[in-house]
Design a protein with these regions (language model features):
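Glycine-rich nucleophile elbow surrounding the catalytic serine of serine-hydrolase chemistry
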Residues: 1-10
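Active-site nucleophile loop of the alpha/beta-hydrolase fold
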Residues: 3, 23-32, 165-170
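Accessory cap/linker subdomain of secreted extracellular hydrolases
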Residues: 13-15, 20-125
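Proline-centered loop/turn at the N-terminus of a beta-strand
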Residues: 21, 129, 160-162
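Short beta-strand/loop motif that positions the catalytic acidic residue
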Residues: 126, 132-134
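Acidic beta-to-alpha connecting loop that harbors the catalytic carboxylate
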Residues: 136-138, 168
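Conserved alpha/beta-hydrolase "acid-adjacent" motif
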Residues: 139-146
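Catalytic histidine neighborhood in serine/cysteine hydrolases
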Residues: 152-171
Length: 171
C-alpha cells in the first residue's frame, strides 16, 4: 500500500517470467499529483506529519524507526501560522532533517525534478496480471491508483488488468 504500491509498480516492469500476478495498492503514480502535492497544491499538514516521522535522514542503515517529529503545540494550525513560511517549517521544526521537504519547496512547478520521478510513462512491458486496488476515501494516492490502471491499459493492451475501488481509505 502506498510506497510499497509504487515498488510493486516498478517491479512489474519487464518482470521475471515467474511473476504471474501483482497488486499495486494505493500506488504513487506521479509525485507531483499524488501524496504531498495534489495537482501542485501542497498538502502541508500531511507532509509535515508523514515526512517528519518517516523521511528523516539516517547516518547508517537501521531497523529502528526515527522518532516522530515534535509538535511544539497541540494546535497544528497555530504551528504553521507561527512558522510563517514552509522554509521556516523546515528550519525551525524539521531541523533540515528531511531533505525531500526542501527539494519539494525548491520545485513548486511540475518541472524536470517531478517529471523524471513519475513512473506512469514507464509502465511498459508489463506481463503479469495486474489488480490495482484503491479506496474512494484515499486522501493520499487516489490519483496514482487510477492513473496506474489507465497507463497499464494503454501501454499493455494484452495484459489482464483490473481496478478494484471500495469504500475505504488509504491502506
Amino acid at each position: 500500500v502506498s510506497y510499497p504500491g509504487f515498488y510493486v509498480s516498478a517491479g512489474m516492469i519487464d518482470a521475471h517470467p515467474a511473476l504471474v500476478a501483482v497488486s499495486p495498492q494505493a500506488p504513487v503514480g506521479d509525485w507531483y499529483f499524488d501524496d504531498f502535492l495534489h495537482n501542485g497544491a501542497f498538502f502541508l499538514a500531511h507532509a509535515y506529519r508523514w515526512l517528519g516521522g518517516n523521511a528523516q535522514e539516517r547516518a547508517k542503515p537501521t531497523a529502528e524507526r526515527s522518532p516522530p517529529i515534535a509538535y511544539p503545540t497541540q494546535d497544528g494550525y497555530q504551528l504553521f501560522l507561527d512558522a510563517v513560511s514552509n522554509d521556516n517549517v523546515s528550519k525551525q521544526h524539521l531541523k533540515a532533517a528531511v531533505p525531500f521537504w526542501d527539494e519539494m519547496m525548491a520545485h513548486p512547478n511540475r518541472d524536470e525534478f517531478w517529471q523524471k520521478r513519475a513512473i506512469l510513462p514507464h509502465l511498459k512491458k508489463v506481463a503479469p496480471a495486474v489488480m490495482v486496488v484503491t479506496g474512494w476515501y484515499d486522501a493520499e494516492d487516489l490519483y496514482g491508483s487510477f492513473k496506474t490502471y489507465q497507463a497499464i491499459e494503454e501501454l499493455n493492451p494484452n495484459v489482464n488488468n483490473v481496478l478494484v475501488v471500495g469504500p475505504w481509505h488509504h491502506g
